[in-house]
Structure formats: structure tokens, C-alpha cells
């Protein structure tokens, strides 16, 4: 595993060209819902301007780029890990599993996988579990590597939409506003309305609420 802490412009250019899959996750911190990952292979001949870490973009800009990425990217796939898997494996290992699912489901086998952060799981393409794909962890890669930026945008928009749907089902929890993160409003809703099947039972605030039954 390579960790590019002081990545050079030359490395960025090299890793941003060719059929490299960028991978990022959204949703490790929330108390509810899936952790969502995305794998994106961009078309070097059809660049997208304005890509950046999804957290640094407005919702409107993310939605516009989400559509453009789907229009121009060579390949996109999304992976999930459920609340039950998060509770069983822990959030780190569940996130790694979701990343593996995102890469395994790509229609194109990438030359390598570039993951935002400081660690990466083993990646394989489809059912070819003997054919391991080279992978690199890139610290702050969502602001450095276009494919990782694209993956962060895809994962963020998908998860936000999932929270909007959950909000329609349980409007009293305010998921459309706080997206499941541990905010004061979420704590108050937990206390007042209780734990939902979609909550992560291993996370402390949820576990403490369950203990009050």
C-alpha cells in the first residue's frame, strides 16, 4: 500500500490519466443508514471541470457534477454496507467491504484503484478473486485526484438521497436535514421516538438509547 502524503504534481497527472478507478466513501459517522462508497473510472479524453472533495461543494454543484459524471465517466459503480453489517463487522471493516463491492461491480477492470484516505482493502474485479488489482491509498485524495473527487460526489449524492427517502418514511427524525449524523436534533428524536431498524445499534448513542427500554 502506498500512502502519498506529499503527492507531487507529476504524480497527480500520472494517477489522473489512464483507466484508474477512484474510490471514496460517505457515511462513516452517522448513526443511521448505510455507508455508501463509489468507484469511478473517468474518461481521460472527456475531462470534467470543477471536480473537488464533495464536502467543499454546495448541494447544487454536487447535483450538477453528479449528472455530468454519469454522462462522461467510462464506468461508475456504487457499493453499500448495511447497518447490520456495520454492527457485525464495525464501521471500518464495513466501509472496506463496501469499497470492495463498488470496485468488483465495475464493468471495466481498472489498471489500479486509488482510495481516499490512509488505507485500502484488497480489490478484485468481479468474481476473479485470484486476480488482485493494484491499489493505493491517497491521503486527501478527494481533493487531489479527479477520479476520487468524482467518487466522493457520487457517494455523497447517493447517500443524501437515501436519507431524504428515510426522512419521507420517518419525518419526525429530521433525516433530510442532519443526514443521520449525531446532531442535537437527532439525539432529541432518538430520545423521543426511539431507535429505528435502520439505526446502527453498535454506535454509542443508539446503544445507550436501547439500554433505556
Curated annotation (Swiss-Prot):
Residues 18-213 form the RNase H type-2 domain. Belongs to the RNase HII family. It catalyses: Endonucleolytic cleavage to 5'-phosphomonoester. PROSITE patterns: RNASE_H_2. Its main location: cytoplasm. GO terms for molecular function: manganese ion binding; RNA binding; RNA-DNA hybrid ribonuclease activity. It is an enzyme of class 3 (hydrolase). A divalent metal cation binds at residues 24-25, 116. GO terms for cellular component: cytoplasm; ribonuclease H2 complex. Signal peptide: none annotated. Its cofactor is Mn(2+); Mg(2+). The gene is rnhB. Endonuclease that specifically degrades the RNA of RNA-DNA hybrids. GO terms for biological process: DNA replication, removal of RNA primer; mismatch repair. It comes from Shewanella woodyi (strain ATCC 51908 / MS32). Manganese or magnesium. Binds 1 divalent metal ion per monomer in the absence of substrate. May bind a second metal ion after substrate binding. It comes from the Bacteria. Keywords: Cytoplasm, Endonuclease, Hydrolase, Manganese, Metal-binding, Nuclease. This is Ribonuclease HII. CDD domains: RNase_HII_bacteria_HII_like. Its EC number is 3.1.26.4. It holds the Pfam family RNase_HII. It is found in: Cytoplasm.
